[in-house]
Amino acid sequence: ARGGGVNRAAFVAVGHVQGIPLGMGHFVIAEGRFDGRHERGEWRNALTTFRARYLRKHATRHAFVSRIAYQRGRNLDPEIQLLLGVENGLRGYPVRQFDGNQLLLLSAEERWFMADDVGQLFSLGVAGFIDSGFVWSEEQSLDLGDLKTAVGVSLLLGSNRLSSRGGIRVDVGYGLNRLEGVGRWVFAAGSDIGF
């Protein structure tokens, strides 16, 4: 309480995820989300997110996966920022290479599954990918000419059917847009194989 008044804040988180079948062997999962805090008559730390993921299974052991993501932050708290790099989808650029209040990411990946239950321990696959994205500050307008693009390959290791753990991926990405003082090759490993 300050000067007899009460400062109140309302925290809001709302979203919807919808699967959309497009026919045999392919579908889209679309998501819209808003998170924010309303206080003193304005929205603070407000983040609007739109995502869509597409999967097309060409054959039993071959699939195409793509995604698009757009996020816009408004009056973000100092400790909150939108980051883009190898850790969240732009696989040819270092961790947290780009930051700002607006993020756009487009990815496409062709996957080939090579072997199932090798020694009853893991499954093996490979993928080729292209990622393109950027992050703009609140003062900048979204400009597709700013997009940074990377291409690369991935080794996909899936756990066996008895394990509750997900798979592991090892990515080798090459940034097509040269950045001052930054190498163009990025090697990364992680547990995000989901489509």
Language-model regions, residue ranges each:
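C-terminal transmembrane beta-barrel domains of outer membrane proteins
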Residues: R2-F195
